[in-house]
């Protein structure tokens, strides 16, 4: 039993010992570093030779050549005609070296791996190989960097990782990529043309079905012109892609520019015979005097951004144009965005401007949950599909008068601006950040609505008339500096129909709480009042129902009626006898009083006469 356990442990140890060998089997083989001062004296050994005209590298795989110094000589390398040797490579490390003669493949295809260490700046006038790998975060300057065309037994390939490469082409030269070509990491590659040719051709070898160009991670590729202000004598494009699909993904970036020309043929920014695909956060900028971005295949943008502009032609030309979850800025003299088979825009923001229809297909145009701004001259539609344009859930600003109301066109749950005047169709939820500019007017019709959802912003600088409804969901943002709607009262400012903020001044004449009080006659016991109106909001009194004739509260009061004095005195001398007086008793008392009064008067007269006598 112990022997069996010991045997298992020994087997495990042996397996572990071989792990490093297996893991790194495909990586750089064990090598001897051979340092060469390229400006050094003539010398010859088994690994290299320096003579009066050149430097010859002799050993593949087993040697890492570290190059330093400066020379006008060329470096010569030889490949092999033996198919079994195609995986053998020359390994070269650049250490602030200048080789004005370049690295020249003298015969047969060559595989080459070049290391450009961080912090180094190097110049190799010409670099080419059938299978070329360049890595390291340093800088390499050249006048030509190419992947040559495949042979019967060695395919072409390119892989650039992290390196900054600047290629300035002579006026009569261009560089080419063949086979599968990949730029990744932080590769930053710039080609500048000399004025007669596109600086970079991709997939030039006919019959090779392996051609492709892929940009990944943060890789960048620039195909520029030496002098954009001076026209060429013929068409000079920025980047020419033949039988090779183009793929950008991650945060990669491609920029290409075409030149003006004194001939009738101008330069395109990017011209391709195959499909172009943009994913993630990648971006393409293509500008030219002919088409900005032209492909005989399909253009598919799923994420990222496209900028394509032309002075004298279309911004984008492709068979099928599909823009999804992306942003596009397109300008042209002819239709800025042209899809010969179809144009489909979904969850995207597209700005298109042309001296013709801005967004056009001879077949169909479909726009879904997108923001579109299409600008064309007077008399032109901004957006047109000859076999129908369908719009759904989108914010459309077009300079044309198209309504999409008649078949085969259709529009649902959208906002449509024709020029500066817009309206809602159905119930629209904005698909992204939108703005009503200062000179724009939007009518939200009855039974229609606009909703601002989470993480979206609605900005209003213009005029909005809300007869339907405007709502903001949690997380949505409304920015409004041009308020409208609502009603001011005697105590409150108006509330904006859009942002729900109070604005303006109070309206002292608008009394929403005006209460009518009917007139009431006064009595001896209670005051009365005139007819009047009282505002419960501001506490004021008015003599009219319009609330225009303000009065004091005291003016509404009618005083009590005055009291009767005689009635008050009689009330104080009433008999305590509970029996009612008769009319006879009353007359008897009256006569008795009169007799007594007459007697007194007669007595007074007799007494007066006696005294006279």
Predicted regions and their residues:
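Positively charged n-region of N-terminal signal peptides that target proteins for export
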Residues: 1-5, 10, 609-613
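Short, hydrophobic alpha-helical membrane anchors of single-pass surface/secreted proteins
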Residues: 5-7, 585-596, 606-607
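A composition-driven surface/loop motif
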Residues: 8, 24-481, 498
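Bacterial N-terminal signal peptides
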Residues: 10-20
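Sec-dependent signal peptide cleavage junction
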Residues: 18-30, 577-588, 606-610
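Ser/Thr/Gly/Pro-rich low-complexity, disordered linker/stalk segments of secreted
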Residues: 467, 473, 561-580
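Extracellular modular ligand-binding repeats in secreted and cell-surface proteins
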Residues: 480-572
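C-terminal membrane-anchoring or membrane-association module
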Residues: 598-613
């Amino acid at each position: 039993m112990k022997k069996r356990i010991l045997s298992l442990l020994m087997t495990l140890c042996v397996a572990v010992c071989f792990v490093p060998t297996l893991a790194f089997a495909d990586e750089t083989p064990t090598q001897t570093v051979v340092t060469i001062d390229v400006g050094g004296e003539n010398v010859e050994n088994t690994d290299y030779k320096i003579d009066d005209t050149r430097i010859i590298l002799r050993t593949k795989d087993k040697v890492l050549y570290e190059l330093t110094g400066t020379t006008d000589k060329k470096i010569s390398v030889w490949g092999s005609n033996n198919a079994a040797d195609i995986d053998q490579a020359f390994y070269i490390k650049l250490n602030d070296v200048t080789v004005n003669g370049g690295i020249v493949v003298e015969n047969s295809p060559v595989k080459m791996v070049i290391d450009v260490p961080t912090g180094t700046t190097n110049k190799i006038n010409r670099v080419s190989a059938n299978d070329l790998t360049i890595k390291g975060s340093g800088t390499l300057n050249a006048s030509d960097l190419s992947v040559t065309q495949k042979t019967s037994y060695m395919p072409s390939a390119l892989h650039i990782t992290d390196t900054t490469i600047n290629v300035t082409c002579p006026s009569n030269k261009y560089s080419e990529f063949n086979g599968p070509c990949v730029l990744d990491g932080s590769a930053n590659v710039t080609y500048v043309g000399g004025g007669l040719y596109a600086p970079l051709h991709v997939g030039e070898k006919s019959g090779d079905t392996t051609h492709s160009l892929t940009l990944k991670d943060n890789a960048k590729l620039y195909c520029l012109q030496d002098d954009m202000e001076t026209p060429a004598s013929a068409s000079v494009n920025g980047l020419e892609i033949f039988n090779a699909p183009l793929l950008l993904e991650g945060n990669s970036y491609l920029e290409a520019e075409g030149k003006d020309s004194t001939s009738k043929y101008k330069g395109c920014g990017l011209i391709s015979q195959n499909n172009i695909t943009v994913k993630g956060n990648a971006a393409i900028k293509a500008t030219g005097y002919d088409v900005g971005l032209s492909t005989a295949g399909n253009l598919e943008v799923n994420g990222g951004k496209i900028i394509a502009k032309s002075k004298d032609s279309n911004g984008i030309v492709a068979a099928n144009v599909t823009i999804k979850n992306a942003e596009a800025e397109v300008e042209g003299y002819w239709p800025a965005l042209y899809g010969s088979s179809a144009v489909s825009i979904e969850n995207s923001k597209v700005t298109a401007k042309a001296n013709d229809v801005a967004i056009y297909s001879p077949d169909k145009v479909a726009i879904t949950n997108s923001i579109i701004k299409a600008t064309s001259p007077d008399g032109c539609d901004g957006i047109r599909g000859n076999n129908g344009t369908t719009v759904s859930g989108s914010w459309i600003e077009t300079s044309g008068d198209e309504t999409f109301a008649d078949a085969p066109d259709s529009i649902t749950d959208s906002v449509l601006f024709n020029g500066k005047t817009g309206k809602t169709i159905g119930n629209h939820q904005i698909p992204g950040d939108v703005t009503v500019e200062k000179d724009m007017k939007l009518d939200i019709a009855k039974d229609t609505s606009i909703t601002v959802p989470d993480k979206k912003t609605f900005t209003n600088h213009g005029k909005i008339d809300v007869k339907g409804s405007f709502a903001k969901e949690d997380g949505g943002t409304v920015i409004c500096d041009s308020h409208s709607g609502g009603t001011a009262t005697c105590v409150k400012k108006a509330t904006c129909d859009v942002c729900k903020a109070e604005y303006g001044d109070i309206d002292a004449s608008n009394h929403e709480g005006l209460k009518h009080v009917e007139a009431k006659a006064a009595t001896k016991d209670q005051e009365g009042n005139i007819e009047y109106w009282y505002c419960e909001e501001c506490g004021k009194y008015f003599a009219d129902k319009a609330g225009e004739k303000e009065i004091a509260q005291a003016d509404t009061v009618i005083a009590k009626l005055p009291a009767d004095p005689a009635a008050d005195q009689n009330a104080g001398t009433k008999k305590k006898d509970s029996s009612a007086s008769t009319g006879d008793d009353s007359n008897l008392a009256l006569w008795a009083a009169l007799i007594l009064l007459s007697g007194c008067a007669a007595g007074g007269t007799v007494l007066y006469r006696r005294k006279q006598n």
